[in-house]
């Protein structure tokens, strides 16, 4: 670990402290969600005039890890952050209203020619899977990939939870 690493951690922690949702979370959850992102360079931190304004992190999950994550969002281990090709937004912090700027910047990342998933929660108790198309991905290809993704995830969840028709 070096000074740059600690500066990143400090900037991200400051954003968490200014987020109504994140400020309630524990230091353990901060470490679990932020340190693997920094170590794997799977994050974006926006800074304006030397002040952090927004942050997001992502993990590339295998189908098995994805099912585990959907069941328990605090279940990711550091090794699982790069376990597959199913990209998930793990953390999104924009306490000063810079979400649109963060979306614009994330969609311009060259390897974002894929779809991105996240769990959204309005109640903090339940979430829904949201889907975003990477900026370099055309709509037709994105739809085809999303349909395939839904089929594979649906089958895996059905198997995991023993759902029947």
UniProtKB/Swiss-Prot annotation:
One of its GO terms (biological process) is toxin metabolic process. Its main location: cytoplasm. The keyword 4Fe-4S does not apply. The active site is at 22, 91. GO terms for molecular function: acyltransferase activity. Its EC number is 2.3.1.-. It catalyses: a fatty acyl-[ACP] + L-lysyl-[protein] = N(6)-(fatty acyl)-L-lysyl-[protein] + holo-[ACP] + H(+). Keywords: Acyltransferase, Cytolysis, Cytoplasm, Hemolysis, Transferase. InterPro entries: RTX_toxin-activating_protC_bac. This is Leukotoxin-activating lysine-acyltransferase LktC. It comes from Pasteurella haemolytica-like sp. (strain 5943B). The gene is lktC.
């Amino acid at each position: 670990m070096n000074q740059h690493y600690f500066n990143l951690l400090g900037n991200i922690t400051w954003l968490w402290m200014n987020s109504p949702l994140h400020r309630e979370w524990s230091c353990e959850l901060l470490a679990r969600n932020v340190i693997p992102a920094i170590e794997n360079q799977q994050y974006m931190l926006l800074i304006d005039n030397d002040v952090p304004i927004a942050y997001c992190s992502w993990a590339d999950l295998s189908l098995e890890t994805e099912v585990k994550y959907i069941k328990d969002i605090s279940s990711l281990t550091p090794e699982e952050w790069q376990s597959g090709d199913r990209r998930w937004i793990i953390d999104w912090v924009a306490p000063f209203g810079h979400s649109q700027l963060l979306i614009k910047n994330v969609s311009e990342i060259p390897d974002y020619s894929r779809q991105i998933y996240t769990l959204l929660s309005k109640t903090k108790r339940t979430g829904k899977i949201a889907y975003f198309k990477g900026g370099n991905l055309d709509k037709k290809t994105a739809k085809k990939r999303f349909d395939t993704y839904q089929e594979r995830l649906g089958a895996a969840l059905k198997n995991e939870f023993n759902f029947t028709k």
